[in-house]
Amino acid sequence: MRVNTIKKIIAAILAAVLCFGVLPSRSFFNTLSAVVKAANADSLNEAYADGTSLMPIGPAFTVDTLLSWEPTNDPDSDYSRSVVPLADRYTGFTVNDYANPDAKLMVCSLANSKHDATNAQGQESFSSYAFNYWQYATSFVYWSGSKRGQVVVPTGEFTDAAHTNGVPVMGTIFFDWGGNSSVVENFVRNYRSVADKLIEVMEYYGFDGYFFNEETAVDYTTAGNLRSMIAYMRQQKPNMLIGWYDS
């Protein structure tokens, strides 16, 4: 349903209320609220897809769209690329002699809670979320989800900000709780080809690894393929970051 259509529906409903003097019920307001929320959630994607907006959206992939992805197939792929190399980490003077210098903090931050409706070039509002304690983070997980697929690529401005502060960034590979096990099975069935493409995407967009959020119940074979995929990725790119969460 397109945004303009939604607006027309709302206008027609309100006109009927005014003309006939019908007192709206609670269910009416619930329906109206749902329509408005749908419009707000999808308006950026719809406008971009319709060619009525020039606002590009951050990349996300299913296993099929990942395997068929090429930078040349996406005219807007440049807008999500990081242009800032990972800076050397600056270590200040010791404040606490008892602090462990080997301690690490991986921040799983809800960077863009609506990745599918987020401008890949940053936001136009001062109320946008800005992460402000890079000095404490050893690594940063671009924690987000997408209706367009399980692989969510960090938008360039977050990677640039992290790299400026010497913090590497991971994209998210998300298999949700209670999800369909066939999604994971398909993802890792040809795990070498998928892993090669994940690495290609990572290198093109300029981030530093992936965080696997694996909450979907799978069988022994699929679990083994997941493990083999990660081992293969480490073999191909020994310095890439890989995080794992399993519930």
Residue map of PLM features:
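Positively charged n-region of N-terminal signal peptides that target proteins for export
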Residues: M1-K8
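A generic local structural motif
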Residues: N4, A16-V17, F126-S128
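Generic short amphipathic/hydrophobic targeting helices enriched at N-termini
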Residues: T5, I13, T31-L32
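Sec-dependent N-terminal signal peptides of Gram-positive bacterial secreted proteins and lipoproteins
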Residues: K8-R26
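Sec-dependent signal peptide cleavage junction
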Residues: F20-A41
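N-terminal module-boundary/linker segments of secreted carbohydrate-active enzymes
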Residues: A38-Q123, A130
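Chitinase-like catalytic core of GlcNAc-active glycosidases
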Residues: Y98-S247
